[in-house]
């Protein structure tokens, strides 16, 4: 008998004594590889140390991720406020968008009127965790900290967005029906909803910026897609249609989502490969998040050389996979893939230079090579 647990539920896996109900093994299932690193780490350690507590697991994880100096405090914060069922859940699975059953729908956590108070007290730990940032100096540790910081900020922003959406819908519900009132009365009622719509757009922008700051794997790209496909059509699309119908004119620019990126500029690789086949070219995909991404001048460069060597870097200008999308490709040729290689990405922007990984060029990303695996 095998006990199968989703790793999203295994922060306190030591509570689940599978043997008590006849299970003789434990299998972890996950679908967000990087994002469930704490659970994977804890699950791997527990069989060797059954006295391991949740606090212990977080302490060990954060010591490796962001350094010994802040690991204890970070572990205390997460163990008390973000551990398993302690973590607030601002989204839900399906039930909102017609015909869609899946994750990523923002959950309404407000009372359903214009006098709501967002339940933010459960997110006090977000600022407590963020305050640790000033104590981190290592570029690599700081980069990893920022990813986890963005993840918890996403949850808080989702709660705010859910409340702002609820307030807007409460106002829209008060607009007289078309067959029961004059056009002027409907327009006047709709205009009273514009401040709520603007507030929703602003809070949604903050959510998207935090979500994009958390992207580091294909799994987090899936989180972006979930919101875009399951929540935004109703929250932003339908409410826009309803308001414009009542107003008799398009919404003002402030009530529309921004068309330019407003978040923290980033350059990164999605789930970078650690191993490649000897003598076979390696394609590298870089993602640039910047308001300058539409500019031909904002083009990343791939720098590579044999691992551990002091020879000059081979510089390869990356080319866009699709115009204006911020996804760039470059290839390390087969001739260079005879042994382990190291590489990093850089991009010159107005006023700043972005690099990936954050420790580059001193500590670039490494790819080992091996003979092809026979299948």
Listing of model-derived features with the role each one plays in the protein:
Residues 1-254:
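Substrate-binding groove of N-acetylhexosamine-processing glycoside hydrolases
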Residues 236-375:
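Glycan-association/targeting regions that enable binding to alpha-glucans and other polysaccharides
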């Amino acid at each position: 008998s095998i006990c199968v647990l989703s790793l999203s539920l295994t922060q306190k896996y030591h509570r689940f004594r599978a043997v008590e109900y006849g299970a003789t093994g434990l299998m972890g299932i996950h679908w967000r590889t990087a994002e469930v690193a704490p659970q994977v780490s804890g699950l791997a350690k527990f069989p060797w140390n059954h006295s391991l507590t949740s606090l212990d697991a977080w302490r060990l994880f954060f010591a490796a991720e962001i350094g010994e100096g802040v690991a204890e405090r970070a572990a205390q914060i997460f163990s008390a406020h973000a551990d398993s069922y302690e973590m607030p859940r601002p989204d839900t699975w399906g039930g909102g968008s017609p015909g869609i059953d899946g994750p990523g729908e923002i959950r309404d956590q407000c009372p359903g009127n214009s006098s709501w108070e967002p339940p933010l007290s459960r997110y006090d730990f977000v600022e407590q965790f963020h305050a640790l940032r000033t104590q981190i100096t290592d570029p690599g540790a700081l980069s990893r900290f920022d990813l986890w910081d963005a993840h918890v900020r996403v949850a808080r922003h989702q709660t705010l967005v859910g409340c702002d959406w609820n307030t807007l819908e409460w106002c829209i519900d008060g607009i007289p029906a078309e067959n029961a009132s004059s056009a002027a009365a409907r327009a006047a009622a709709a205009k009273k909803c514009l401040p709520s719509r603007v507030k929703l757009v602003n809070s949604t922008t903050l959510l998207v910026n935090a979500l994009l700051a958390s992207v580091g794997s294909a799994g987090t790209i899936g989180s972006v897609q979930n919101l875009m496909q399951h929540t935004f059509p109703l929250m932003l699309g339908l409410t826009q249609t309803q308001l414009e119908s009542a107003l008799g004119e398009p919404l003002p620019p402030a009530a529309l989502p921004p068309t330019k990126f407003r978040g923290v500029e980033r350059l990164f690789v999605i789930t970078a490969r650690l191993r490649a086949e000897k003598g076979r070219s390696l394609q590298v995909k870089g993602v640039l998040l910047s308001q300058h991404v539409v500019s031909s001048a904002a083009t990343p460069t791939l720098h590579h050389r044999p691992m551990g060597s002091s020879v000059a870097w081979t510089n390869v200008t990356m080319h866009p996979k699709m115009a204006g999308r911020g996804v760039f490709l470059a290839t390390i040729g087969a001739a260079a893939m005879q042994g382990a290689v190291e590489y990093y990405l850089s991009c010159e922007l107005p006023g700043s230079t972005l690099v990936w990984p954050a420790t580059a060029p001193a500590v670039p990303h490494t790819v080992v090579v091996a003979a092809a695996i026979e299948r």
